[in-house]
Amino acid sequence: MLTTELNTTDVPAVFSRFVSVIDDKHWMSQVKLCNEEIRGNRLLDRYLHSEYAIAYQLSQMTELTRRYGSIPRQYCQDAAIYPAIGFAVQVLSAVEGFGRVDGELFRRRVHGAFKNPADMRGLRLELSVATHFIRRGDHVTWPETTGVGNFDLFIEGLGKDGLEIECKSISDDKGRNIHLRESLDFFGVLKPQIESTIAGL
């Protein structure tokens, strides 16, 4: 069901298919929003690039495609794009494997993941776990497409009744009372006032 291997020579074709299935407006608009936030608070730069890494990598590929008509071969060798192109090929194989109705539901889930880093982490974790079991030769189903169960993945043939998997991703902020984003926003407001105070000393 999921593609588990990809050759770098396939990157331009995979990206082109991904754009046609998912539409680059979803990551381009998110990157635009992030860049506007960064202009307002430079302290958010590293944080937002990390939280929206897949969107930023895909936006670079979109820009290259617009400039050159396709992703240049030397850029396909850049390991910095591997997480995004790996995500793209997995999403494509999942959408194609689900059928029309379930594929559309999955597409919408991908659209939402570009707007919410926690959703993106969860989706990538599910795809990673599914890839592990598929490479072992197991058959994986998403209960959200079958309407049976409220777990994330079902591995048929493991144990007596199969294996239900619930994927949980944890961010650096999990369990903290004050999250990094809130701290950076606060420091962004505070920084100009501190700088003006220091300048007067």
Where are the regions that the model predicts?
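A short acidic/basic microdomain associated with nuclease active sites
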Residues: R135-E156
